[in-house]
């Protein structure tokens, strides 16, 4: 039968097809969606002061700088690992510890990447899929680690959006 219909278009399906078409023709870039103020700290900041700020402001990830030059991304996981290592030496004394003490140079992996403001969101999704240890993607104008931070993307920022769709 020529008039046999295999599917009836409905508003949801039509809207979804139009959304997909829009994403293919004009992929969304990381900015403005992931634009946000990112607080960073200098490596010589006393660790007790840094931990106090984390507790007060509930930061979970933040960049560490050496005189304005990016050095590392510190996360709660990194702090937990550092505390576990330090506890093996006995009582943990924070009096002379600096933020820089949290930086591990074991060369195992990098938990961050930098991207430019013009990076497509689908590229960021791919980065998170391909690098399971990635905890954050930091956004600068041109992807330069020492550039002004314009935003940060965590895996949950991407995947919460996917769940909403």
Task: Kindly give the residue locations of the regions a language model identified.
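Short N-terminal micro-motifs specific to bacterial/archaeal maturation
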Residues: 4, 38-41, 70, 112-115, ...
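A structural micro-motif recognizing beta-strand termini
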Residues: 42-46, 58, 116-120, 130, ...
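Conserved small-residue-rich
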Residues: 31-85
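Charge-enriched, short contiguous segments at helix-coil
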Residues: 1-25
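Short, well-ordered alpha-helical segments
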Residues: 11-15, 48, 147
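Tandem CBS (Bateman) regulatory domains
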Residues: 20-37, 75-134, 152-165
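A glycine-centered beta-loop-beta connector
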Residues: 54, 62-79, 128-132, 137-157
């Amino acid at each position: 039968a020529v008039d046999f219909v295999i599917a009836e278009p409905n508003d949801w399906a039509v809207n979804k097809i139009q959304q997909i078409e829009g994403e293919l023709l004009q992929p969304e870039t990381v900015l403005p969606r992931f634009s946000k103020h990112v607080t960073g700290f200098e490596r010589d900041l006393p660790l007790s002061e840094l931990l106090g700020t984390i507790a007060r402001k509930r930061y979970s990830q933040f960049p560490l700088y050496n005189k304005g030059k990016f050095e590392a991304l510190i996360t709660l996981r990194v702090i937990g690992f550092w505390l576990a290592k330090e506890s093996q030496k006995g009582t943990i004394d924070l009096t002379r510890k600096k933020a820089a003490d949290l930086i591990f140079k074991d060369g195992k992996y990098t938990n961050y990447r930098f991207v430019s403001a013009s990076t497509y969101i689908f590229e960021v999704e791919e980065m998170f899929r391909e690098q399971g240890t990635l905890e954050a993607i930091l956004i600068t104008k041109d992807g330069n680690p020492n550039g002004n931070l314009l935003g940060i993307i965590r895996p949950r920022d991407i995947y919460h959006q996917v769940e909403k769709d």
